[in-house]
Structures are given as C-alpha cells and as structure tokens.
Amino acid sequence: WVDNINLKGNNNLVNINAGFDETSFILKNKFQSSNLQVFDFYDQTRHTEQAIKRARKVSRVYPGTKSISTGKIPLKDSSIDILFLLSAAHEVRSNEERELLFNECSRVLKKQGKILVVEHLRDLPNFLAFSVGFMHFFSKKTWKSVFDKANIKLEEEIKFTPFMSVFVLEKINKK
C-alpha cells in the first residue's frame, strides 16, 4: 500500500509504535537510503490493555529504538519527511493524550511531509470480524477530530483491506 501513496522526500523517517514493532525492519528495507528513527511510546502505567502487554513480549526491537512519552517527540520542529503510526495510535486510550501525540507529530513534520496512520476502525466490517472487540478501535469521526485538533488534514483514506484504513495526513501550514 505504501507504493500507492505519493511520498516525496523520504530522507528523514520516523516510525512510532507502542512497543509492538512489526514494521520498522520492513520500512528500512523499503526506504534503504533513509534515516529511520524509531520511537516507542508505551507506558505501562497509562497503556494498560492486556493485548499490548502480551504483544510486547514477542516483538523484536528495532536497533536504536528510543522510549518517548506521547507528549514529547525528541526531534526538532519541521524535521521529518514521513512519520508512520502503524496500528499503534489506538493504544493511546485517552483523547487528551492522543491529541498531545498528534500535536507532536504535526510539530516535527516538515511543511510538505506526510503522516501515515494505519488503524482498524470502529465500523461494521470490524464489528463483523471482532464482535465486541471492535470497541477497542476508534471511529473515523474520532480520528478526524484528533487530526483537526492537531492542525493536520486528512488528505486521503485508503482501505487496503475491508478492516484496515490508511490515513494519509498533511500538516496544515498556517500563513
């Protein structure tokens, strides 16, 4: 699905996860000449879902992964070309904390940069697949509200399966 997105400037990449990282090795292979920085926002006192605790036990850690808080990404303003949040942002259960995370993502993103968020949605296909487990996910409306509050616009939504959405986001550059 990454091949179908117009990604200009892929020198400085960030992949942010909740400690369950299935994607950094794949991203580095895809963008071999890039500078990929990987951050893990997992905080056992705030992110208490049992599924993420189990997943962390079996996940490989990408070399150089740094632990961060959702409220502070240790990067300069406007320094990142592409920021990935791949099946991770829904682990931030608090609306306020999720807004802090996306405000930080917006802050570090270059003017023409992209944020790619991959998530299940709280919708009919996911209800049919996960039954009440779909309550772990957020609706498109909830995501859109978070993006709006972080000064990020939804450029495109791509359904790469009936169950998964890719949100292609851009920073709204104030004049």
State where each predicted segment sits.
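Class I SAM-dependent methyltransferase SAM/SAH-binding core
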Residues: N12-N15, G19-K72
